[in-house]
Design a protein with these regions (language model features):
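A ligand-binding cleft/hinge motif common to bilobed small-molecule-binding domains
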Residues: 89-102, 155, 185-205, 295, ...
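Bacterial signal peptide processing site
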Residues: 12-15
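C-terminal motif of bacterial Sec signal peptides marking the signal peptidase cleavage site
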Residues: 6-10
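N-terminal export leaders
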Residues: 1-2
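Secondary-structure end/capping motifs
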Residues: 230-310
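Conserved C-terminal helix/tail region of periplasmic/extracytoplasmic solute-binding proteins
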Residues: 301-343
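Pocket-lining segment of extracytoplasmic ligand-binding domains
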Residues: 93, 171, 177-266
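Short, glycine-/small- and polar/acidic-enriched structural segments
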Residues: 18-164, 172, 209-214
Length: 343
């Protein structure tokens, strides 16, 4: 794999489109990729393509990149396994859940984390429910999307206060998109919602958030046999480096990111988006090493403890650090030092 320095000029978006002039995006390393190579990246809600396009990180790529949007981690995984996509962007829970169900052909090649933050997860109560504390949820209806990071945070918050999600409350399992309308209709007493949803619901009482439970892990995954294709391996390495650069761009262009993502995609005000951004910041990319793998393992362990998965899953066979040098080089070029993962 040949790595050479590359400077990409981030032009192509006007000041009106981007919320201000974009600075030059620098890419630490470029991989030599055979002509005609194509990558399809499966994402959710534009979380890969939006920063990629805003930062113009794809300028000069020696391969074709197409983004395809899916609803939920399970759909992304299915796209990878069917061959409809080469790279998938998902959260912390889907890989351990898939492994527990017998899926062994996936591997994580990129990992972001943001431990110590809420993760934008809020357990909220209906104002008319009589619920003021988590302890008040005993016997109450609590909505969450099963098999997700929100599921794990909900169970973890209840456990901290002496309650078991499976036995001490009435668990209401819903698809992610159904949680907010169900809560708004008064069909449940409490629900775990995302930051933008909290504001869209009119700022209901917050009982707890993801701090101390959330890892902020987001993963880039591939089907294992894709790593047997030298052309794809080269293209994926180059893509990952550019994805790190695009992610780091967000932190140096915070107002533009808030406007483009929180306001235009998530549908909340600039002030609300800025507050969410300032509370949690950006999940940095980390090398896949002993420390980041250990953090990922806490997710699998948490899913088992909450009963989301039946068996204990060892995540170490499902991570691959072959691109660590690319991640480290890009972070160093951008002056990014990810927070320590040591407990």
């Amino acid at each position: 794999m040949l790595l050479v320095p590359l400077l990409l000029s981030a032009c192509g978006l006007s000041d009106d489109e981007s919320g201000g002039a974009i600075d030059t995006v620098k890419i630490a390393a470029k991989t030599e990729v055979p002509a005609g190579t194509k990558l399809v990246v499966a994402e959710q809600n534009g979380t890969q393509s939006l920063p990629w396009n805003l930062a113009n990180a794809g300028q000069g790529t020696p391969y074709e990149v197409d983004f395809a949007d899916f609803s939920g981690g399970a759909a992304v995984i299915e796209a990878l396994r069917s061959g409809a996509a080469d790279v998938g962007s998902i959260g912390e829970a889907p890989v351990p859940i898939a492994v527990d169900s017998g899926v062994t052909d996936l591997v994580t090649i990129g990992l972001q984390a943001n431990p110590g933050t809420s993760g934008g997860y809020y357990l909220v109560a209906r104002p008319d429910s009589g619920v003021r504390t988590i302890e008040d949820l005993r016997g109450k209806r609590v909505a969450y999307p099963p098999g997700s990071g929100r599921h794990m945070v909900t169970a973890g918050l209840l456990k901290r206060h002496g309650l078991d999600l499976r036995t001490d409350v009435q668990p209401v399992e819903l698809a992610g998109a159904e949680v907010v309308p169900t809560f708004a209709a008064g069909a449940v007493d409490a629900a775990i919602v995302l930051g933008n949803q909290y504001y869209q619901l009119g700022e209901p009482p917050i009982l707890g958030d993801g701090k101390g439970i959330n890892t902020g892990i987001q993963t880039l995954i591939v089907r294992r046999d894709v790593l047997d294709d030298p052309a794809k391996v080269a293209a994926i390495g180059d893509y990952l480096g550019r994805a790190v650069a695009a992610n780091n761009w967000k932190d140096t262009h915070a107002d533009q990111w808030v406007d483009q993502y929180y306001v235009k995609v998530q549908g909340i005000t600039f002030e609300q988006g800025k507050k969410l951004y300032e509370e949690d910041g950006i999940a940095s990319y980390y090398p896949i090493d002993e420390q980041s793998t250990a953090l990922f393992q806490t997710v699998a362990d948490g899913l088992h403890e909450t009963g989301t998965i039946k068996g204990r899953v060892d995540v170490s066979p499902f991570v691959d650090g072959r691109y660590n040098d690319i991640v480290t080089a890009q972070n160093e070029l951008d002056g990014v030092t990810p927070k320590s993962l040591k407990s």
